[in-house]
Amino acid sequence: MTTLTKQLAEQLQIHKEDDLIKDLQLDQWFTGQQLADDVATLHDFFQEIGLMNQDLALVCLDNSAVYPVLTQAFWELGVVEHPVAATTPIAQLLTEFNEHTYAVIVVKQELAEQLTDQVPLQKKIVKLNTSQELTIFINTELLSKRPNDTGTSPNEEDLGLILNTSGTTGKPKRVGLTHRILNNAAHHNIDSHKMTSADTTLITMPMFHINAQVISTLSTRLSGGKIVIATKFSASHFWQQISENHVTWTSVVPTIISILLINDQANHIYSELKAHIHLRFVRSSSFALPERKFIAFQDRFHTKILEGYGMTETSSQSTLNPINAQKIGSAGKPVGTDVAILIDGKYETKGTAIGEIVVRGDHVISDYVDSQPNAFHDGWFLTGDLGYFDEDGYLFVKGRSKDMINRGGEKVAPAGVQSILSQLDFIEEIVILGMPDDLYGEAVTAVVKPKNSLLDEATMIAQLQDYANENLAKFERSTQIYFVQDFPRNPTGKILRPQLKKQLLSI
């Protein structure tokens, strides 16, 4: 066993009589013993069909209590789990299967029926405490060609997870995370969030994603805490789920925070249950939360927001705001990570100049599964994000280097402009893009998702322009303004800027 799998097994034994994971869809808690029994059942099944160290497993499941036990069983054998979105269409699954050599595919029931006639795989059903019917497709052709030996045991440098990057700026990259990297990341999370066995976390984020996989699930399990799993986020159920299950923290994205602020039913339920809600904090990541929403959420729901900065390549977070020393608008301070700003070939850790954020540490990858050496230099991972440190050592992220707008030689950082304009009351969300322009090369373009406002577009444009004139440099002001009902997004709520740009170009 690796250090990681040994700790996971030990926690189940320590808490074998205790409720550890609740599946809200089933309305059922599972004890450490029940979870350990499921891990053993899956371990034996996978061993019987011939899975070996570093075999690949494709997983397409909804959030549920079976996810953590499936992952642990894979890791104990050294199998590399590659989870994908539960909404992945069958055609995309088949493309993934054909491009890579998977030993097994684990899918939800709706996809199993479609997949049966599409792939030359053997279908098996495994019954567990956490899932009465877990459908597993076996690549018998691959496994039958194996020599009759038991293979090697997993070690610290073997891959445990392959995750696709969120792919908001192009084709997703495959990120491979080793047992060592995953274990290190989880313990950095435990330390920085001060997690203990007294904590209970609510998972509403998709479990194929690094946030739920490592920050919420793995870190909580290694700290001995409890996990409550929702199939997906529901504004009308959120505060009830927090209250009834004594949740002490949860990890979300700014989109969820925005919804909770404007959803009348959620606000009504909170007002009725607030005496029974004892959150230590709500963790927010993926993209920056506008200051007015940050303040409004903390004031209305009487809990702290902790913003951080991380990515799949760092196996979760690299920075986090200290629990008792938050700085609004920042991504916090480095956590178990060396973070620097690359400016003119120099790695700066002080000063306030903007440059590319680079990171290194014991939880950061050294290459992609499909090698991309240009993403690394001198032991640093080049994130492609722009940012700076303030005088107190807090990191401020200003956007992607690829998103930087070049207006006639003057550079505009979209995130900074978005942060300022989002203070306008009628703006729910705003995206600043560079659109083709014959004169300047790129035109600063604002795309606004308004709140339910009684203002007409002409009035909103006038207010936006007046506010920009008062608060932005002339070259930062938008010369084009569009209004949309919503933005194209990935499964975690990130806005897909390339798709948005294509939509605007087609108008």
Question: What does each model-found stretch correspond to?
Answer:
Residues 330-336, 346-377, 410-412:
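Conserved ATP/PPi-binding loop(s) of AMP-dependent carboxylate-activating enzymes
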Residues 29-33, 160-184:
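Conserved AMP-binding A3 loop
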Residues 470-494:
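AMP-binding/adenylate-forming catalytic domain of the ANL superfamily
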Residues 247-252, 265-326:
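Gly/Ser/Thr-rich phosphate-binding loop
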Residues 361, 367, 386-476, 499:
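AMP-binding/adenylate-forming catalytic core of the ANL superfamily
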Residues 183-200, 208-249, 263-264, 269:
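Conserved AMP-binding/adenylation subdomain of ANL enzymes
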